[in-house]
């Protein structure tokens, strides 16, 4: 167990690290964060990884579905939520999102340092230099000049080698917790475990000795029900909902967990099998394609290695599943949006905490289940049956909350339906919540103009000392 650093030991470790770098040594013995260092040694892999830049479209998910603004009221995701794109944009997008705010210095801003954790091989470098106590300490802006290389080689590979590795110690602890230590895993299993470093549900610890640390809620298992019991047991919440005052859970991107529930996971078809297939270079050399993307874009190298059906057939099946998942998603959202507004009205009419507690528990559980299903972006392919099951329980629990709310509101003298304001667009939904988006956007633009060039200049100066 790592001992907690005192202020003196933290300062000393920082001084040692700075001296080490000034001497012109590598920043880390285990991690080379600069992806371009490997462009000659692993030419095909590097070039295909670089092609993730072609996945450049930014899709505004809140504009597509304004319900989510209300569902995340009081949380950063109500400000800005874009659909994910290629690995090449990981650092760019976390810098640019309104969720990270507009910090003016290293101690400023709304989010913790942990928000860098899935974005860059600079993260394992920093953990190796400073320990987890040093890395997780402080605000997100502290990492601006340090975390500049986007998701790449050293996130998944040992330094200068194709050998796979877990580069973040909290992931090793999570895999141990579910009885699948990386050190004992097969190569096939490791090809999914390295993806599970980021494509998972996680939270930031609130315990004083681990405050801000990333942890996966897997102590009781990886199903939605098991994680829910875990979170309830430690009385954890990500935020308090601005309307209903519910202690909420925000699911992240649990692809690994939902993949395990589906037919591919149960048959141990790895992430790499479908998203990073073996291909042949123009020179006739076989290599793993690092342009992580949709398997249908490389059908012959992915799906066709197992399936006898045509591409058109399988695309059709997948689209049907997506449509069914979307239908259930919207049903859950309709119930949840109404539940939040009805709960707000109940508070307004004088409801007590004791009266509201069972209602808020239902809302918490319903939205957690909705969120876990929709935050797993590939769930319609990975585990459509599980997605529909989970969304079905979300609808039921939200309906339970609304039945209780109807009874409580009647007790308070209100028998008419609670009016739901116009939330038909992102802008209208944000206005209902009183969000000053013009101010937030202006502050973000000023941050990008003032702070980002400084961060990049500091990073360039630091990396110039590397051998």
From Swiss-Prot:
Its main location: periplasm. Keywords: Calcium, Electron transport, Heme, Iron, Metal-binding, Oxidoreductase, Periplasm, Signal, Transport. Ca(2+) binds at residues 201-202, 250, 252. It holds the Pfam family Cytochrom_C552. GO terms for molecular function: calcium ion binding; heme binding; iron ion binding; nitrite reductase (cytochrome, ammonia-forming) activity. Heme c 4 binds at residues 271, 274-275, 382. Substrate binds at residues 202, 253. Residues 1-27 form the signal peptide. This is Cytochrome c-552. It comes from Shewanella oneidensis (strain ATCC 700550 / JCM 31522 / CIP 106686 / LMG 19005 / NCIMB 14063 / MR-1). The gene is nrfA.
């Amino acid at each position: 167990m790592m001992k907690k650093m005192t202020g003196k030991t933290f300062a000393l470790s920082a001084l040692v690290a700075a001296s080490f770098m000034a001497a012109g040594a590598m920043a880390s013995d285990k991690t080379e964060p600069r992806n371009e260092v490997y462009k000659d040694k692993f030419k095909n892999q590097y070039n295909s990884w670089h092609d993730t830049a072609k996945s450049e479209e930014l899709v505004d998910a809140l504009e597509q579905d304004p319900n989510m603004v209300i569902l995340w009221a009081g949380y950063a995701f109500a400000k800005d939520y874009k659909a994910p794109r290629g690995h090449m944009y990981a650092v760019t997008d976390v810098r640019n999102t309104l969720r990270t705010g507009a910090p003016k210095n290293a101690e400023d801003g709304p989010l913790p340092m942990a928000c860098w954790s899935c974005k860059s091989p600079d993260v394992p470098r920093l953990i190796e230099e400073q320990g987890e106590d040093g890395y997780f300490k402080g605000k997100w802006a502290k990492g601006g000049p340090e975390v500049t290389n986007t998701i790449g080689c050293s996130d998944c590979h040992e330094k200068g080698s194709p050998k796979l590795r877990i580069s973040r110690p909290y992931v090793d602890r999570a895999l141990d917790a579910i009885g699948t230590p990386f050190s004992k895993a097969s190569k096939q299993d490791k090809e999914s475990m390295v993806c599970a470093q980021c494509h998972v549900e996680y939270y930031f610890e609130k315990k004083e000795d681990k405050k801000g640390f990333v942890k996966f809620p897997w102590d009781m298992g990886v199903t939605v029900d098991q994680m829910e019991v875990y979170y309830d047991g430690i009385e954890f919440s990500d935020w308090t909902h601005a309307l209903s005052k519910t202690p909420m859970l925000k699911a992240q991107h649990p692809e690994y967990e939902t993949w395990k529930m589906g037919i591919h996971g149960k048959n141990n078809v790895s992430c790499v099998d479908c998203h990073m297939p073996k291909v042949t270079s123009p020179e006739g050399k076989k290599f793993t394609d690092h342009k992580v993307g949709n398997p249908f874009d490389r059908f012959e190298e992915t799906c066709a290695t197992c399936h006898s059906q045509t591409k058109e057939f399988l695309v059709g099946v997948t689209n049907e599943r997506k449509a069914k998942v979307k239908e259930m998603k919207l049903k859950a959202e309709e119930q949840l949006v109404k539940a939040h507004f009805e709960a707000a009205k109940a508070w307004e009419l004088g409801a007590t905490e004791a009266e509201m507690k069972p209602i808020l528990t239902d809302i918490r559980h319903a939205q957690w289940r909705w969120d876990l299903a929709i935050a797993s972006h590939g769930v319609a392919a990975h585990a459509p049956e599980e997605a529909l099951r989970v969304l079905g329980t979300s609808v039921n629990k939200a309906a339970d909350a609304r039945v209780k709310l109807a009874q409580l509101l009647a007790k308070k003298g209100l028998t008419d339906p609670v009016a739901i304001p116009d939330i038909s667009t992102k802008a209208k939904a944000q206005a209902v919540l009183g969000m000053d988006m013009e101010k937030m956007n202006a502050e973000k633009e000023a941050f990008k103009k003032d702070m980002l060039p400084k961060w990049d200049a500091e990073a360039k100066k630091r990396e110039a000392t590397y051998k």
